[in-house]
Amino acid sequence: MFDTMPPVKGEGDYGYGTPKELGALLARRDAEEVLADRDRMITEITAELSQIVPGGNWLRDSEGTSTPCGEFGSTDGEIDFGPHYVSQIPVPASLWPRASQAVIDIAAKYGYTDVTSRTENATDETHKDLTIRDADGGRLAFGSLEASTMQVTTGCYLTAEDKRKAREAAPK
């Protein structure tokens, strides 16, 4: 039944999203650029953490996934829940300030500048965590207790191809 129903469109939507939602996503970088930067950032962070924490070897533990954007639901934009990375070696409390600061410094180069939570006065008996956000809703989560873990979720973005299609279909 639902497959035959026409899609619900908002005012001014010509098939690619309402002007407000689509306009916001067209102004953002292409999803491909964001994902490439995310991968570079993770590579830099895991390399630095491996230097700080002896024996730390970061491995991709799962594949990522993507989902439509709630905030930009009329568009083809997607949020990418990146792969989960794990090091079997936890960050000791004595190294947590240095490790978490390294993550903050590297993430800032990629636009993740809003530190929303950071464990202070870490102990080896409690979970240590760091969460950093970017201006477009991206989130970097880094934590440690019995092992260390990291995942980066992007904000909502359109692919270059989706942007091209939307621009070509726009009323002239």
Predicted features and spans:
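Extracellularly exposed regions in secreted/surface proteins, prominently low-complexity, repeat-rich
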Residues: 8, 13, 17-20, 124-172
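Tryptophan-centered motif/residue detector
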Residues: 58, 93-96, 156
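Alpha-helical protein-protein interaction elements
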Residues: 6-8, 50, 77, 88, ...
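Long, charged/polar, surface-exposed segments that mediate recognition or autoinhibition
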Residues: 75-124
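Short, Lys/Arg-enriched charge-dense amphipathic segments
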Residues: 60, 74-90, 134-151
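Ser/Thr-rich, low-complexity intrinsically disordered terminal regions
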Residues: 59-71, 115-138, 146
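Functionally engaged cysteine thiol sites
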Residues: 67-72, 108, 154-163
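N-terminal leader/targeting segments
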Residues: 1-75
